[in-house]
């Protein structure tokens, strides 16, 4: 089973395309939708939904994936639910760059203070970060600086922020999922 979390643009047709691409790894791909506008509510909702899916799951090696803001949540929810994560161009600093897009971006900073301290150290090697050198929305080099101490970084030379085509990375994702 692969759980997919969309980014800030929840209505993007690219979400359906990524789900279809992920089905080449596992036919059981589940999209969880969330508001993107209420961080504390989103965290509670995502934890509940992922836990529910894991309770009914028969896959011994489930995976959670997310793009952009979905990558932010996939890393945290995956850690809390003890499943491996793949993040594409994760938005690691939503409290900085969601200003004006959502009502209370400061909730992201509050969530960070309530999370397990040093969670990335405890999550070491359980997340695969795929970053685009052509990300027009976020500074992928800044993300790499934070993540490379804990996770493998795979660089993509062509995709933009929304990562429309993940197919060149499917074999790597499949191998990562198999490690379970």
Curated annotation (Swiss-Prot):
SUPFAM superfamilies: alpha/beta-Hydrolases (SSF53474). Pfam families: UPF0227. It comes from the Bacteria. Belongs to the UPF0227 family. This is UPF0227 protein Ent638_1623. It comes from Enterobacter sp. (strain 638).
């Amino acid at each position: 089973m692969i759980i997919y979390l969309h980014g800030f643009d929840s209505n993007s047709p690219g979400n359906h395309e990524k789900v279809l691409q992920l089905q080449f790894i596992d036919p059981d791909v589940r999209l969880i939708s969330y508001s993107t506008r209420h961080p504390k509510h989103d965290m509670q909702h995502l934890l509940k939904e992922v836990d529910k899916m894991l309770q009914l799951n028969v896959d011994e090696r489930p995976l959670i994936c997310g793009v952009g803001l979905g990558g932010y949540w996939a890393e945290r929810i995956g850690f809390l639910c003890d499943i491996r994560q793949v993040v594409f161009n994760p938005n690691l600093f939503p409290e900085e760059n969601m200003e004006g897009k959502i009502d209370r971006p400061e909730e992201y900073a509050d969530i960070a203070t309530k999370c397990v301290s040093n969670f990335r150290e405890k999550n070491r090697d359980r997340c695969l970060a795929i970053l685009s050198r052509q990300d027009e929305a976020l500074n992928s080099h800044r993300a790499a600086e934070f993540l490379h101490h804990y996770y493998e970084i795979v660089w993509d030379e062509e995709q933009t922020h929304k990562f429309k085509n993940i197919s060149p990375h499917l074999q790597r994702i499949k191998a990562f999922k198999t490690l379970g």
